[in-house]
Amino acid sequence: MQNFIEQIQKCENLNDLEAIRISVLGKKGILTEGFTKLKELEDEAKKEFAAKLNAQKEIFNEAYLAKFKDLENLALEERMKQDALNFNYFDESITTGALHPVMSTMDKIIEYFIALNFSIEKGPLIEDDFHNFEALNLPKSHPARDMQDTFYFDDKRLLRTQTSPVQIRTMLAQKPPIRMIAPGAVFRRDFDITHTPMFHQVEGLVVEEGQKVSFANLKSVLEDFLRYMFGDVKVRFRPSFFPFTEPSAEVDISCVFCKGKGCRVCKHTGWLEVLGCGIVDPNVYNFVGYENVSGYAFGLGVERFAMLLHQIPDLRSLFEGDLRLLEQFR
């Protein structure tokens, strides 16, 4: 047995150790054969011989298990070395990912308004008629509803056509002052070179008690915002109509492609329409129970901004997943 103990101590791997175990405790092992011969002995001799065999087996098992544990730990350490990650290795064939141009544009817009202490508010994509239309001064008989082709589930539920319902939900849940933006996906039944059935908007709302908010405040914020997004551009406000603001305006910037000189993109006017805005209509305040307040609202299409920032001619290409296009925005 001493010979086997010495062999165990010299073992350098688990396979050799297992071979020793089989030679001792296997079906034809030395100790196994010894236990088999017990039946040939008389009672007293059997008892004495069995005690010796068990003692040797115990000594062997103790040496075997100790060595097995050591070799198993060494094998584990070796596997860990082989499997370890080399954090200094760089495979140039693997490229890093990048934000989609719509998401990077959305992030830039949000970043600006967060710096002005605007909160980010969210609402459901599936809306009801009250929040999406009626509370925004668009009753069922209002002709302005024809301006939007809507995805209806039934008479009461629809896919929101704008993020303006988030403004209504926020005003119903909070008291003034409110400074918020509502970024998110919206849906309209439209699909062409400048429209897709799903797109993204960022709408903003500011409401203060009393008559503290004026169109001049709105104009100042939007002019600074547009120059933050597009650089040194000219900004103009044109009178327009929106059911939920009065007065209302469309906002244009000097064409970022031709620097205002006139080109095919701006239809040779030198101007590009980028967003709508206005002073919140008093009728909207009636729906949310506000009194003696003033405020302004604005809304913009994120895809429109992304197209202008990255000079993308077809809006639909933003949603086709073409890697040749997306790789340009790394």
UniProtKB/Swiss-Prot annotation:
Record-level Gene Ontology MF annotations: ATP binding; magnesium ion binding; phenylalanine-tRNA ligase activity; tRNA binding
A single GO cellular-component term on record: cytoplasm
Cofactor binding note from Swiss-Prot or TrEMBL: Binds 2 magnesium ions per tetramer.
Compartments it resides in: Cytoplasm
CDD domains associated with the record: PheRS_alpha_core (cd00496)
Organism of this sequence: Campylobacter jejuni subsp. jejuni serotype O:2 (strain ATCC 700819 / NCTC 11168)
Signal peptide limits: none
Ligase as UniProt keyword: yes
Listed name of the protein: Phenylalanine--tRNA ligase alpha subunit
